[in-house]
């Protein structure tokens, strides 16, 4: 009876320990960076307890393991009962609407993305539950137009969420979570995106755009997957601007192996799994093998670039300038690698998606092509059909067309997570508690009647001729807004404008028979940035 009583007490104490560990530790602060540390600690505690109980109690290791195992089970039962009760009934977000499963686990949202992209899922949830939806235990999706400025704007008190720690310890401008660190690094980047630097990039980019149009001219009259060519083009451009050397994808008509490794690796991001799960993939060698291959490749390219002298500065020149010719420290090298990878990934995928979306809308609206061509008549192109960016950057309909395309097809369509300050924030009169993850999905807001009149209609003139069609301009943020906005926006817009102008001047664009592109656009990948794998069109010489 004494042994039975002791075992029962041990199980009770185990359950109590589970509750206490949740209430006093796991529900407070952040614990995502080193998930396997907890596994190792639990394994150590269980093993050492088994040995100690066997030695002190004079029982066999088998009996000791049974007793310790029982205690371990009751510990986790106590921990998860405490966690479930807290998330369902006592969590600060318990009063916000949303699916019941989202209260319990962040994996509920991830499971819902098996057959649809995140931006589609969020649209469905907001249609069902309203402007604020609880999509995870501590996560809210918010589509009130005013929320964009409150969460992302210059006066926002929100910070970056745990999502940005996925590449730790490698850092980058994108991953800095603390405002002071980010602002300091952004000043280094900013020299690479001034007017003088952009004029230099324009010269470098033309070489690759000429290759792109040579390939497109070869495909006149045929069905071509324009998405592939824009991806080849964008990665070649950003490889040149990041490392001084392109990936030669326009020449080989295929993905460079390192880019294919990168694209294969970002598939996991489309499920928006909790940060601790992503950290498992990053920190476990067997799961992160391809990631480390890409990092090693990036390191080699960066070292070559550091030893090169370039006549026309690239983005990397600005990042290397603070070194003044000396070798970087380990921390500086990690930062340079992260920033170089950021140039390639953030500048390529998003620009290719934007250009593909532009072609989609050009094919859907041939009447807009006539307006755009009329606008370009006053501008002289060179012998290759190239327009100087300075001459077209202020064209109202061209810019309106791009704005309208990015409103309906934002390259980063759904989740850009932020963490609310300790005292919380207020959105539309509702208090959102501190320490919560919040985001404003641009794909949903861009189609919201609260932000735009006739939101599903494609009307470039709303941006310069009919301002009443825009109810809240601050809600439009395809490049984000505020201190963490996309620093590469000037380069992206220069590339989009000049490529689009040459497309309009050179080709007529239509969909192949039986295709209108809608299904392909609405079922695009959403892995933080949007990925449009297929967009078949037929290009013919301008009539």
From Swiss-Prot:
Task: Identify the pathway.
Answer: Alkaloid biosynthesis
The subcellular localization recorded is:
Membrane
What domain of life does the UniProt record list for this protein's source?
Answer: Eukaryota
Which SUPFAM superfamilies does the protein's record reference?
Cytochrome P450 (SSF48264)
Q: What is its main location?
A: membrane
| Ranges annotated as spanning the membrane | 41-61, 65-85
| Glycosylated residues in this chain | 225, 403
Organism classification, top ranks? Eukaryota, Fungi, Dikarya, Ascomycota, Pezizomycotina
Q: Which organism is it from?
A: Aspergillus sp. (strain MF297-2)
- Report how it sits in the membrane: Multi-pass membrane protein
Explain how it is applied in biotechnology. Answer: Notoamides have been shown to exhibit antitumoral activities. Notoamides A-C show moderate cytotoxicity against HeLa and L1210 cells with IC(50) values in the range of 22-52 mg/ml, but the IC(50) value of notoamide D is greater than 100 mg/ml. Moreover, notoamide C induces G2/M-cell cycle arrest at a concentration of 6.3 mg/ml.
Could you tell me which InterPro entries the record lists for this protein?
Cyt_P450 (IPR001128), Cyt_P450_E_grp-I (IPR002401), Cyt_P450_sf (IPR036396), Cytochrome_P450_monoxygenase (IPR050121)
Gene Ontology molecular functions: heme binding; iron ion binding; monooxygenase activity; oxidoreductase activity, acting on paired donors, with incorporation or reduction of molecular oxygen
Question: What EC designation does it have?
Answer: 1.-.-.-
Q: List GO BP terms, alphabetically.
A: alkaloid metabolic process
Q: Does the keyword Zinc-finger apply?
A: no
What keywords would UniProt list here?
Alkaloid metabolism, Glycoprotein, Heme, Iron, Membrane, Metal-binding, Monooxygenase, Oxidoreductase, Signal, Transmembrane, Transmembrane helix
User: What is the name attached to this protein's record?
Assistant: Cytochrome P450 monooxygenase notG
The cofactors named for this UniProt entry are: heme
Where, in this chain's numbering, is heme bound?
486
Q: What class of enzyme is it?
A: oxidoreductase
GO CC annotations? membrane
Q: Which residues form the signal peptide?
A: 1-21
Function as written in the Swiss-Prot or TrEMBL entry:
Cytochrome P450 monooxygenase; part of the gene cluster that mediates the biosynthesis of notoamide, a fungal indole alkaloid that belongs to a family of natural products containing a characteristic bicyclo[2.2.2]diazaoctane core. The first step of notoamide biosynthesis involves coupling of L-proline and L-tryptophan by the bimodular NRPS notE, to produce cyclo-L-tryptophan-L-proline called brevianamide F.
Q: Which family does it belong to?
A: Belongs to the cytochrome P450 family.
């Amino acid at each position: 009876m004494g042994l039975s009583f002791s075992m029962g007490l041990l199980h009770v104490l185990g359950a109590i320990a589970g509750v206490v560990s949740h209430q006093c530790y796991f529900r407070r602060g952040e614990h995502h960076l080193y998930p396997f540390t907890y596994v190792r600690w639990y394994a150590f505690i269980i093993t050492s307890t088994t040995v100690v109980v066997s030695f002190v109690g004079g029982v066999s290791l088998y009996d000791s393991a049974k007793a310790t195992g029982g205690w371990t089970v009751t510990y986790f039962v106590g921990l998860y009962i405490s966690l479930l009760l807290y998330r369902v009934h006592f969590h600060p977000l318990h009063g916000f609407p949303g699916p019941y499963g989202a209260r319990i686990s962040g994996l509920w949202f991830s499971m819902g993305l098996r057959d649809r992209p995140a931006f589609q899922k969020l649209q469905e949830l907001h249609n069902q539950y309203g402007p604020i939806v609880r999509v995870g235990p501590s996560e809210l999706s918010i589509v009130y137009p005013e929320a964009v400025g409150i969460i992302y704007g210059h006066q926002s008190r929100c910070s970056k969420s745990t999502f940005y720690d996925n590449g730790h310890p490698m850092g980058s401008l994108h991953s800095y979570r603390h405002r002071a660190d980010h602002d300091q690094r952004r000043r280094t980047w900013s020299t690479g995106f001034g007017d003088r630097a952009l004029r230099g990039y324009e010269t470098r980019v033309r070489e690759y755009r000429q290759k792109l149009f040579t390939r497109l001219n070869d495909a006149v009259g045929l069905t071509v997957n324009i998405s592939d060519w824009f991806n080849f083009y964008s990665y070649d451009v950003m490889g040149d601007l990041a490392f001084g050397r392109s990936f030669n994808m326009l020449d080989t008509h295929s993905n460079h192996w390192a880019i294919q490794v990168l694209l294969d690796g970002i598939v996991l991001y489309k499920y928006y799994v909790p940060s601790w799960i992503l950290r498992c993939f990053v920190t476990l060698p067997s799961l992160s093998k391809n990631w480390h291959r890409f990092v090693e490749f990036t390191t080699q390219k960066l070292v070559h670039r550091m030893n090169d002298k370039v006549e026309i500065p690239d983005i990397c020149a600005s990042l290397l300038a603070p070194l003044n010719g000396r070798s970087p420290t380990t921390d500086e090298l990690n930062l340079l690698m992260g920033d170089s990878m950021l140039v390639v990934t953030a500048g390529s995928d998003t620009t290719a998606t934007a250009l593909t979306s532009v072609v989609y809308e050009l094919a859907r609206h041939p009447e807009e092509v006539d307006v755009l061509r009329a606008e370009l008549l006053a501008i002289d192109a060179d012998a290759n059909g190239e327009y100087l960016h300075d001459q077209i950057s202020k064209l109202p309909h061209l810019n309106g067309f791009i704005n309208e395309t990015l409103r309906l097809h934002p390259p980063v369509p759904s989740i850009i997570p932020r963490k609310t300050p300790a005292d919380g924030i207020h959105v539309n009169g509702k208090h959102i508690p501190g320490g919560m993850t919040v985001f404003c999905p641009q794909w949903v807001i861009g189609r919201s009647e609260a932000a735009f009149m006739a939101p599903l209609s494609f009307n470039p003139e709303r941006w310069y001729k009919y301002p009443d069609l825009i109810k809240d301009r601050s809600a439009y943020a395809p490049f984000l807004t505020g201190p963490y906005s996309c620093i590469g926006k000037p380069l992206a817009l220069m590339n989009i404008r000049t490529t689009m102008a040459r497309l309009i001047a050179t080709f007529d664009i239509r969909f192949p028979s039986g295709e209108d592109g809608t299904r392909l656009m609405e079922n695009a990948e959403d892995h933080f940035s949007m990925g449009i794998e297929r967009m078949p069109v037929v290009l013919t010489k301008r009539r």
